[in-house]
């Protein structure tokens, strides 16, 4: 099912990477049900980071799930994946079905972020950790409030922006993480929560 897909084969980036917008892939009822479930049943906790040597606890909440107890380190903090939740697995399968026709991907983990309102965002960063490998594919699904998602090129500083809606899927591919940073922009006009699921493929550990 693809309820709204502008042109999923089009690249939202002008160069040095690929970002495809698959549009809203869930019905309004499905998206509402998933949002309610995720808010109530995911093991949310406040994110932690080490920035300039200081330990920071963020207002934004996170959760990390996977097929194995993957260790994932970013912003100076290590995390261990929880076992797959059945509803997360269902969402993952629907995302993989969207990608299957052109570029089949099998994801084995999911990092979730919960933003209570527009006062919470995500600073500029790239998902370029070694455990994800080179030219990794990351699928991002949004539930809840519409939020502005921005990209900024690491060298040229050129920007691209997209408003991510309830039930929308975008996919980052190729050299995107090597050349672009991305962020969730804050807004004082948003008073409802947003949950973002980023499905990833972790490399074998050991």
PLM regions with names:
Residues 1-206:
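Non-heme Fe(II) oxygenase metal-center motifs and adjacent flexible, charged/small-residue loops
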């Amino acid at each position: 099912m693809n309820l709204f897909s502008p042109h999923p084969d089009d690249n939202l980036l002008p160069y040095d990477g690929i970002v495809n917008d698959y549009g809203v892939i869930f019905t309004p009822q499905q998206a509402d049900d998933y949002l309610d479930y995720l808010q109530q049943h995911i093991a949310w906790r406040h994110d932690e980071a080490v920035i300039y040597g200081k330990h920071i606890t963020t207002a934004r909440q996170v959760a990390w799930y996977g097929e194995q107890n993957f260790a994932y380190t970013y912003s100076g903090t290590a995390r261990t994946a929880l076992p797959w939740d059945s509803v997360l697995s269902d969402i993952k399968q629907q995302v993989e079905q969207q990608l299957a026709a052109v570029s089949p991907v099998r994801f084995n983990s999911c990092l979730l972020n919960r933003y209570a309102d527009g006062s919470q965002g995500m600073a500029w960063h790239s998902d370029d950790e070694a455990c994800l490998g080179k030219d990794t594919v990351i699928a991002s699904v949004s539930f809840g409030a519409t939020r502005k998602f921005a990209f900024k090129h690491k060298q040229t500083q050129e920007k691209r922006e997209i408003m991510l809606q309830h039930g929308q899927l975008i996919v980052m591919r190729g050299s995107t993480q090597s050349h672009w940073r991305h962020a969730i922009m804050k807004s004082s006009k948003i008073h409802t929560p947003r949950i973002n699921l980023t499905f990833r493929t972790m490399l074998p550990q050991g």
